């Protein structure tokens, strides 16, 4: 078996064109253009690349984007003060604090301070809680984007045994809720999980997000499984790989996402979808 590649770049391009049309329509009707505020703390090269991509896509589809960069030793109060100003800015629909953030900054306090209706990353307790209650509001970008990929590929998820490898607040936990909403029987594995291979072997749908290059080999995967690789890891030779060994997994899976070019582009475009949703649903005036 040779897996069908789920091309995240192609799907993201379709969504991008759709967003562009919606913005053109808003302009024709003299409606306000959505605004996204991006906050970067420190000089993490990967984070700087991600921020540039997000701002670039904003420009492509006609969004307004504002960008703030702070040194790594910034006082938490300075970030909270900026967020308060952005919360009260009627031209800003979405606020994004790029992860990771330095240890002296309280993750929970920062994301709790963003107004839920401007939390386009979907990390505010209100938004994560709403997802758990089967009443999703603004949803975490990567998990929501993965569901979008499955829908575009016309994969029917109801009744599938889904295994989420990784239990982070950013991907694993919200993804498990998305999988439940999608009708899957869902298992979440983490660092304390015993016999991980057993769980993976039984997965019809496998989502992997642990940050370990080529960790999961094709031998572990069920024949005909759907494999979604969220990992993005840079090797010593400069090459980028996922958490799944793509070559061996492709021989067993029915569908698989590549790295790069899979989940990454969808995550970025989903951020803009969330920003437009926030504008239309919560901030029209």
From Swiss-Prot:
Pathway of action: One-carbon metabolism; tetrahydrofolate interconversion
Superkingdom to which the source organism belongs: Bacteria
Annotated GO biological process: L-histidine biosynthetic process; methionine biosynthetic process; purine nucleotide biosynthetic process; tetrahydrofolate interconversion
Gene Ontology terms, MF aspect: methenyltetrahydrofolate cyclohydrolase activity; methylenetetrahydrofolate dehydrogenase (NADP+) activity
Pfam families for the chain: THF_DHG_CYH, THF_DHG_CYH_C
EC number assigned by the record: 1.5.1.5, 3.5.4.9
Subunit structure: Homodimer.
Family: Belongs to the tetrahydrofolate dehydrogenase/cyclohydrolase family.
Protein name: Bifunctional protein FolD
